[in-house]
Amino acid sequence: MNIKNINANEKIIDKIKTCNNNKDINQCLSEIAKIIHCEYYLFAIIYPHSIIKPDVSIIDNYPEKWRKYYDDAGLLEYDPVVDYSKSHHSPINWNVFEKKTIKKESPNVIKEAQESGLITGFSFPIHTASNGFGMLSFAHSDKDIYTDSLFLHASTNVPLMLPSLVDNYQKINTTRKKSDSILTKREKECLAWASEGKSTWDISKILGCSERTVTFHLTNTQMKLNTTNRCQSISKAILTGAINCPYLKN
């Protein structure tokens, strides 16, 4: 990495830190794309507040026709980039997915993306503290572009900017409060023990309080997490990171 690239990266990082809204974030994404010589970009974070209907946040300049088709056809479920990003942290070149076998009954998302103008591309996985995940993707419509060279160039630059980008995006979008910030320590304790299969009586003995108190705390978690029963509260608390192994330290 030369001095010119370092200065450009520092300039973008400083600009990201001063972003006040998603429009500013979008402008920074556009500048990052220019630095790594890419035509398209997509920044997406999936918040698993619900298994059936997760909250998906996207900032991009992808072709509108492709985005509409992607959403209408429910391609999120079959997207190999999304699947990869769930459990990986290293960037990946999309050409890796071209070599993998696709089930006959499943749509070939990469091939369909290419037919819509996203010929080549690569992605950087994103993971948040509240079990959210996503990716920062870049693509190009030029089939003759040397993707491996672009990918290498991006891999030395984007990781320097991505942490600031994710942090400031989440800071701006504060309407998505972390569930663990609204639960009290006692409520977390009751949920954590309930997730271990303990009954109300068991939890009362473990925590040294009455069964009525345990029921009170668990009922409060339902209201705060917008759930209808104990099982759903446990599920949502785990999905959103409201309860985890070190809960007693919170």
Curated annotation (Swiss-Prot):
Pfam families: Autoind_bind, GerE. One of its GO terms (biological process) is quorum sensing. Residues 200-219 bind DNA. Keywords: Activator, DNA-binding, Luminescence, Quorum sensing, Transcription, Transcription regulation. It comes from the Bacteria. GO terms for cellular component: protein-DNA complex. GO terms for molecular function: DNA-binding transcription activator activity; transcription cis-regulatory region binding. The keyword Metal-binding does not apply. Transcriptional activator of the bioluminescence operon. Binds to the OHHL autoinducer. Belongs to the autoinducer-regulated transcriptional regulatory protein family. This is Transcriptional activator protein LuxR. The gene is luxR.
